[in-house]
Amino acid sequence: MISLDGIRKVFKAKRGSVTAVDGVNLKINEGEIFGVIGYSGAGKSTLIRMLNMLERPTEGSVIVAGKDLSKLSDRDLRIERQKIGMIFQHFNLLWSRTVRKNIAFPLEIAGVPKKEREKRVDELINLVGLEGREEAYPSQLSGGQKQRVGIARALANNPKVLLCDEATSALDPKTTDSILDLLVDINEKLGLTIVLITHEMHVIRKICHRVAVMEAGKVVEEGPVLDVFRKPKEHITKEFVKQVTEPEETVQHLLNEVKSGRIVQLTFVGESAEKPLITNLIRTFAVDVNILQGKISKTQEGSYGTLFIHLDGPKDEIEKAITYMHEQQLELEVIAGA
């Protein structure tokens, strides 16, 4: 659906130049939700703006639905841009227009007849859950409602791709989740390809199928969300994963608290996160099992979790319990107790 080949973006400055995106290659599949995560200055905003040519790449090609956008004439590019919707962190609504007229705006520009335009606006209002707020102005809306207007407006021309530029960064956690749920619903109902950028791993975990991690203009890691959570390779990726998996207290604190037995860190992925592991350990082996800390989260591809447990008892029984856990295909690390 989307292919980025050797994308590079250099901005000229008074003292030299700044490379914002440096040699990025990405393939984004049709119908998937693809996330790009990175800290401020990583180049992710520049990258997403090149997907619809709001920024033109210095080098490389941007191919969307088989067409190289970087080689199109201005007229042809305007036509192709209608197939790519975009929503923004600060909504970018027209404050003098009602909800209905904001959503209708791109249809007016496209020359859609009034009756057809009104029908499409009604469909979109229902899709994003803004029934009863059609005649309200942006100043009368909550942050979440404003973003719903932005989403509806971005979908007005039936795009094939939706770009989300930090779309939930200005929202509180509860509203963020409601907008993320809406994006998943739209993805499933419309088969829409969604590309989002964020600095929050919670957003990636909750709705993305695959993720790319950016640092200093480069993609340093990429893959299915579950794989990246399970085995992050780069230091920056590990930092992001810790946002949603790291227990509140440190491992060092656990080491100081426990004087005997073994402390084991378990990583659950997919179906293994649903198994009654602790119950089976207690029933099968002569060991005491104490849960120290843990968390299980849901991703679009299945469950993911981390768990710290303390095993105490006869040494041979502890060894049997650890062997059993290995046999359950769990990621396991003994972090204390030789």
Curated annotation (Swiss-Prot):
GO cellular component, one term: plasma membrane
GO molecular function, one term: ATP binding
Keyword Transmembrane: no
Top-level taxon: Bacteria
EC number(s) on file: 7.4.2.11
Catalytic activity field: L-methionine(out) + ATP + H2O = L-methionine(in) + ADP + phosphate + H(+); D-methionine(out) + ATP + H2O = D-methionine(in) + ADP + phosphate + H(+)
Pfam families in the record: ABC_tran (PF00005), NIL (PF09383)
Binding annotation for ATP: 38-45
Alphabetized SUPFAM superfamilies for the sequence: ACT-like, P-loop containing nucleoside triphosphate hydrolases
Record-annotated ABC transporter domain positions: 2-241
Main localisation: membrane
Transmembrane intervals: none
Complexes and interactors: The complex is composed of two ATP-binding proteins (MetN), two transmembrane proteins (MetI) and a solute-binding protein (MetQ).
Name assigned to this protein: Methionine import ATP-binding protein MetN
Gene: metN
